[in-house]
């Protein structure tokens, strides 16, 4: 069963002071031409990841601009989401023995949802979990878009060979960057649209510094000492073990340093519990290492507080679609040390926002520099905030999606 996610309209007016005038004008013009257009955003979960956060804000803005926008999530049991998590990892390059039984399970759930989709002008399908639904709907009149948020540049051949025919039945595909496109994908149209953050969401809105610090202190963290922070799902690709190893190297040079790993348990990610249990052992052994989840009261507002209190944010990703936590930290004026992978270099360059790294040793070296040179760290972070303001705030993403929808519908009616 498809689940409709309740979304409150978000007036565009409060975003206008952040926009260059031409961007605001283009959004207004596109929205006027799309008034009443029925747009469905379809993904696997309503909480726990960057896609869900994006859709909550994006759909709200589209509604306020007059589009008949909806957000729905697919249902499925634990067996289905175990299959889709394996598929997700395989598309990012992990070797995967994708069995016939798993393929059948995946297709059965997708087929069951197809009958519920009717009456839309545009359907935007996010990531691999619902990617086969298009196959079972018949041609219809709707325009279908597959929106891929992960790095599929070197997928496992078996998994991608299975999924590719279903992806290619869509009218267009959207990737974060051109480098993510699998080499053998053939589509009528491809677009490249990076994600963005909502500066007025509970995770990113401005907060008084004393409120942020007191909130973090309530979780037992010493806010008078340096704090390293990684905000990421508990996923091997986010390398929480590498983050801990980095922290341990930094602690040799800066004994007062602490590390907080903050992540959420998403409904479509059963593997997260395995990763969480593996790192929770280290948490118990080190009083300066903290592991928090949404299940112990660390929601979006608390993440905001942690990011504003952190001295340095770490994003020790091995593979990354975009890494929204990088832009979130830079928006708050906090320097970032992050893996040079996926969409992270779009947001961050050495000396502009922070530093890109490929090893634990490099990460530790850069963090020690930032801890020992707070004035330089503040200047580096300020430069990163300017990049985010120009390129990675929600109105730019809204404009890009409205452009795509307008162009696709114009072509369909030609």
Regions found by a protein language model. Give the residues of each.
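Nucleotide-activated donor-binding/catalytic signature segment of Leloir-type glycosyltransferases, i.e.
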Residues: 263, 267-305
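Conserved donor-binding/catalytic core segment of Leloir-type glycosyltransferases
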Residues: 40, 217-238, 259-260
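Conserved acidic donor-binding segment of nucleotide-sugar-dependent glycosyltransferases
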Residues: 350-361, 369-374
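Short hydrophobic beta-strand element within catalytic cores of glycosyltransferases
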Residues: 326, 335-338, 348, 356
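Short alpha-helical segment that forms part of, or immediately flanks, the ligand-binding pocket
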Residues: 304, 327-331, 345-346, 352
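Aromatic "clamp/platform" in nucleotide-sugar-dependent glycosyltransferases that forms part
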Residues: 318
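C-terminal alpha-helical cap of glycosyltransferases
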Residues: 394-414
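A short, well-ordered alpha-helix in the C-terminal region of glycosyltransferases
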Residues: 369, 376-390, 397, 403
